[in-house]
Amino acid sequence: MMNRIVNDQITLIPYYRNDEISLLWYQDSEVCKQVDNTDQIYDLTKLHKMYDYLTSHGSCYYIQYEGVLVGDVTLQDNSELSIVISKEYQNLHIGRRCVSEMIHLAKEQNMVKVSAQIYPFNTQSQRMFLALGFQKVDEEWYEYKLI
């Protein structure tokens, strides 16, 4: 995998182990609630297990915004998309731009759709995915049809 340039501020960098930065994102209980619907923060074991799974089942990238790693985004082989952005960088449309780039990646990989699981309380993510053209297909699932 190579870097994916989203725009002059955002670059997606293929995952590499960087516990010092990434563990901080997953030690925020509000972020964990958005991602896993749990208030339990991650330890290194859980973080490694998650990234090992994501990297062996898809394309996992760090999100670099203006030179700073601020989150991660993954397009799994089963077409499921996941994204995490540290709280202090949310609401800057970084996620919107990264999800759009993952849609382009899905097209390059000849996927027929992209799906995302978003919990009912996460209205911020729901609004973003709907604004990008995703359709709600179930209580927690959103899809973007590519064909």
What are the residue ranges of the model-derived segments?
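Conserved active-site alpha-helix within GNAT-family acetyltransferase domains
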Residues: 96, 120-138
